Regions:
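Glycine- and aspartate-rich repeat motifs characteristic of hemolysin/RTX-like Ca2+-binding segments
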Residues: 1-71, 81-82, 125, 136, ...
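Acidic glycine/aspartate-rich repeat arrays in secreted/surface proteins
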Residues: 13, 55-158
Length: 158
């Protein structure tokens, strides 16, 4: 079952006990999953996403920028996953995120040229840096809880 919010509708509550694909729209949405393994996509806007129980997947497939940063309120390691569209997250190969492409630290900065996804442990911010420690600016796309035991294995590129 898939549900997509119509334009100008702000909230989506997934009910029942079966897995549902819930997708937002271009404004700031609140999407709350159910007890099943849901796929939740905020689409555009600064969204608040809650998966609920179950092995949830949070999808990021829209243009990155300051008006498109989603807060995941209950990301559970290792049950949940973050899915990244490689048309948006340019330079990432499809499949599981490589360990070399992931960095976790308190600065939120890439340390070497391979770092692409950076989890800032003290704030929960998640960044994409298309050239690692090169000259391109990093872009925030999500906020999770602080100090999670998150690793590269929690990210899937499609």
């Amino acid at each position: 079952v898939s549900v997509t919010l119509d334009a100008n509708v702000e909230e989506l509550q997934l009910t029942r006990s079966s897995a549902i694909n819930g997708t937002g729209n271009q404004i700031a949405n609140v999407i709350v999953g159910n007890s099943a393994a849901n796929t939740i996509n905020g689409a555009g806007g600064n969204d608040t996403l809650t998966g609920g129980a179950g092995r949830d997947a949070f999808v990021f497939d829209t243009a990155l920028g300051p008006s498109n940063i989603d807060r995941i309120t209950d990301f559970s390691v290792p049950s949940d996953s973050i899915r990244l569209d490689n048309d948006v997250f340019i330079g990432l190969s499809a499949g599981g995120l490589s360990s070399q492409a992931f960095r976790k630290n308190t600065s939120g900065n890439a340390v070497d040229a391979n770092d692409r996804i950076i989890y800032e442990t003290d704030t929960g911010r998640v960044w994409f840096d298309r050239d690692g420690n090169g000259s391109a600016a990093k872009v925030q796309f999500a906020v999770l809880d602080r100090n999670l035991a998150i690793t590269h294995a929690d990210f899937i590129v499609f």
